[in-house]
Amino acid sequence: MISWIKGELVSSWQANNKFYILVNCQGLGYEIQTLESVFFDINSNKISEKEIILWLKHIKKEDSDMLFGFSTKDQRDFFIQILNIKGIGSQIGMSLLNKFSLNQLITAISNNDKKSISTVQGIGQKMTERIILELKSKVINKEIEKENLNINNFLEKNKDLDSIFKDIDLTLQSLNYSKKEIKNLFPKLINNIKNSSLEKESISFENLLKEAMNYLDHK
């Protein structure tokens, strides 16, 4: 299976609101349907024609063999999730990612924004509802994973804070707050620290615990 490609641009063209590039990789020419944003980045020299790197999804059918190319792995993986929804094909997936950035699409799905999603050509009300139903829990879980990774990375670089947060976690659990409540709280505290709404000298176990309980009691 082809996961990504690195090569040199041979040509690019547009047909019926679809965007294509031909990439030379070690003497072989790969025809790839790509996103409008990638197409225009290449043609405006924001992406070097000499070294194009794309994440790929290879779709093989009885009557066709197609490659779809994306600038990031997250885009490619989201495209694959869209394809796993019954009744939705590759062109609907490309249309969604052409209409919205990945973050915009995730936000629309998370917020049940049927109006925005249904503005994509070829997507009606029922398909919009199916997309939200199938993907909402997945995109929310993905965002939670990303947020947790950011928290872990931040605390890894700030060992003193890491120790304080572990103590806060244990203290709040002893006060019968649930693990879920505590987990949802930590990003708020860390954002306050990052945004400097907390003065450096006030970052202590006592002050952070007080702020944590204030959040939990007024949520």
Swiss-Prot record:
Superkingdom of origin: Bacteria
GO biological process, one term: DNA repair
Compartments, as annotated in UniProt: Cytoplasm
GO-annotated molecular function: ATP binding; four-way junction DNA binding; four-way junction helicase activity
Primary localization: cytoplasm
Region Domain III: start-end pairs: 161-219
Sequence segments annotated as region (Domain II): 72-150
Region described as Domain I: spans on this chain: 1-71
GO CC, alphabetical: cytoplasm; Holliday junction resolvase complex
Alphabetical list of InterPro entries matching this protein: DNA_helicase_Holl-junc_RuvA_I, NA-bd_OB-fold, RuvA, RuvA_2-like
Family, as annotated: Belongs to the RuvA family.
UniProt free text on domains: Has three domains with a flexible linker between the domains II and III and assumes an 'L' shape. Domain III is highly mobile and contacts RuvB.
Xref: NCBIfam families: ruvA
Purpose: The RuvA-RuvB-RuvC complex processes Holliday junction (HJ) DNA during genetic recombination and DNA repair, while the RuvA-RuvB complex plays an important role in the rescue of blocked DNA replication forks via replication fork reversal (RFR). RuvA specifically binds to HJ cruciform DNA, conferring on it an open structure. The RuvB hexamer acts as an ATP-dependent pump, pulling dsDNA into and through the RuvAB complex. HJ branch migration allows RuvC to scan DNA until it finds its consensus sequence, where it cleaves and resolves the cruciform DNA.
Classification via HAMAP family: DNA_HJ_migration_RuvA (MF_00031)
Protein name as it appears in the record: Holliday junction branch migration complex subunit RuvA
Gene of this entry: ruvA
